[in-house]
Each structure stands twice: as C-alpha cells, then as structure tokens.
Regions:
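Multi-pass membrane catalytic core of lipid/isoprenoid biosynthesis enzymes
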Residues: 61, 66-111, 156-167, 207-219, ...
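Acidic (Asp/Glu-rich) catalytic motifs at the cytosolic membrane interface
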Residues: 48-76, 124, 130, 172-179, ...
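Generic alpha-helical transmembrane segments of integral inner-membrane proteins
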Residues: 17-21, 39, 43-50, 87-98, ...
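C-terminal membrane-associated helical module and adjoining short loops/tails
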Residues: 2-5, 122, 140-302
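Short, aromatic-rich membrane-interface segments at the entry and exit
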Residues: 33-37, 105-110, 128-132, 153-159
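Hydrophobic alpha-helical transmembrane segments
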Residues: 24-28, 95-102, 120-123, 145-150, ...
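Short, amphipathic, aromatic/basic-enriched membrane-interface segments that mark the entry/exit
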Residues: 4-11, 73-85, 101-106, 124-132, ...
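Topogenic membrane-insertion module of multi-pass membrane proteins
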Residues: 1-65, 78-91
Length: 302
C-alpha cells in the first residue's frame, strides 16, 4: 500500500488548488452546492494527475534508476511492478472521468488534460519550450475545469494570469534544474538520470525568459485589478459584476512580494526545482499567500 501512496504523489495535489479560482473570484464560494461541485472537480483532477505520475514513472523508470533521488520511486526501485502501475493508472483514470462527469462539462477539461499528458510524457517534455508550454496548458485546463464544474463564466484575464504564472514557475523550475547540472550532464551525458533537454535551459536565454514572464504576470494582474469591469469582462455580460473590484488593488503588494521572493529563492538560494515545496514550506511565501487570500476574500465577499 505504501508504494502505491508514494506513486500517487499527494504532495503534488496542491497544484490542483487553482481549480477553485473560478469559484473564489465569482463570489460564489459560500454556495454549498457549487462548493461541492468544485471539490468534486478537484478530486477528479487529483486522481487524473496521480495516474499521469504513475505512467510517467513507468516511461522514465530506466532513467530514474540512475538518478540519486528518483531511483527511490516505487516503480524505479522495483517495490511496485509495471503491471501494477498500469492497472492502478487505468483505475485512477476511470474514477477521474466518472467523477468529472458528475459536474457538468468538467469532464472535457479532464479529457483534454489526459490527452495533453499522453503527448507530454513520451514526447513534449523532451522538446525545449514545448515542455513548459505544456505545463502552462495543464494549469489552464485545471482553471477551466473548475469554472465549468460550477457553470460559471471565467474572465479571460484570469486565464491569462494563470498561463503566465504557470510559464514563470515552469521556467524557474527548468532554470533551477539546469543550474544543478554537472559539466558531464551539460555535455549531454545520459548516464546520470537527468533528461538531456535540461541542458538547453542552462544559458542566459532562460534567465531572460524568466524575467519576461515575471513582468508579464505582474503587469497582467495589475491591469486585472485596476481596469474597469466593462473592460475586464471582455464582452461577457455575466462577468461585469465580478471583475474590476476597486479593493483588489490592495492585493498587489502580496502578489509583487510573492513573485520577487520566488525569484530570490531561485537565483540566490538555488531553489525552484519543487515549486510546491516553496509554496507550502517557505514562511514568507506562506504569509504572502495568506495575506492575498485575506484581502481578496474581504474585497469579494464583504
């Protein structure tokens, strides 16, 4: 049972929290029925993502056995067989599709996510830039799935913020991974368990891309908080009463601090390989996140 639980990677489920963005920003988080629908979508994405992790471990088992950390994963270490992994992945996918079918059109987001991952695992993650864009697309599908589950309109600006933030985090992750590569790995040595594609992110170009996405994220979110509702709604009438809340400008200090703190951790502390760890273990980031939630919640719901 323990190998299965480790293969599910429950710590990674924190990435699925963005599913609640549509519910939170629509001002409907106090609606019990909609909250249940959003939680159902969250559970469905957790099951789907765990299935993807198992399949990914099956594909990468030979390379993982050469990696100092990944060699301890159940499939790479042999504590869980490939056949068992395939069986569990099928069960998880079936359960995920069943749950998502209970909440409107969220099943299409789950389906799209699974198709994306079916391309990502064997191919896209080995192609420079397409790998990080695939990660961003996965987060976008999570946000869309959460909104479709509660049948709520979703601001294009919020989707844009999600995509840009996901690209920023993915590029920071690749930059951190590349910074920890040895000279042999940078030269293309595949006997160390690292993917050769990581060497492509070792140059200054990655630093420039990180800076661009950090700036784009901050500018887009700033506009989201400052522009009038009629502009933010992008022609969607149902969004006009939910966007452009004047008080949202007070969330900007927390957002700016969070992005700058993250950059500091990546460039000064050599972190960034595990974004979920930074979000849940770094005290300043936790405080910034709680501050954002408190201010945004107060503006939207009071």
């Amino acid at each position: 049972m323990l190998p299965l639980l480790k293969s599910l990677r429950p710590r990674q489920w924190s990435k699925n929290v963005v599913i609640f963005a549509g519910l939170a920003f629509s001002g409907a988080a106090t609606d019990q029925g909609l909250l249940v629908s959003a939680l159902t979508a969250f559970a469905a994405f957790c099951l789907a993502s765990s299935a993807v992790y198992i399949v990914n471990d099956i594909f990468d088992r030979e390379r993982d056995r050469l990696h100092p950390i990944k060699r301890h994963r159940p499939i790479a270490s042999g504590t869980m067989s490939v056949k068992a992994g395939i069986l569990f992945a099928i069960i998880l996918v079936a359960a995920s599709l069943f749950l998502s079918s209970l909440v409107g059109t969220a099943v299409w987001a789950i389906g799209g996510y699974l198709v994306l991952q079916a391309l990502y695992t064997p191919w896209l993650k080995h192609v420079v830039l397409l790998d990080v864009f695939s990660i961003a697309a996965g987060f976008s599908l999570r946000v869309l799935g959460g909104a479709w589950a509660i049948e709520a309109p979703l601001s294009p600006w919020l989707v844009a913020c999600t995509v840009q933030l996901a690209l920023f985090l993915a590029l920071c992750k690749r930059r951190a991974e590349a910074a920890n590569l040895s000279p042999e790995q940078l030269s293309g040595d595949t006997t160390t368990g690292q993917r050769p594609i990581l060497a492509e992110y070792a140059g200054q170009g990655t630093d420039m891309m990180v800076g661009i996405m950090a700036a784009a994220t901050l500018v887009t979110f700033t506009l989201y908080t400052l522009l009038p509702a009629s502009v933010l709604s992008a022609g969607i009438p149902d969004l006009e009463s939910r966007a452009g809340e004047p008080g949202m400008v007070f969330t900007l200090p927390f957002v700016f601090y969070g992005v700058l703190r993250y950059l500091h951790l990546v460039y000064s502390k050599g972190e960034g390989e595990r974004p979920e760890r930074i979000a849940t273990m770094d005290p300043p980031m936790i405080i910034a996140g709680l501050g954002f939630v408190a201010v945004a919640g107060g503006v939207i719901y009071f």
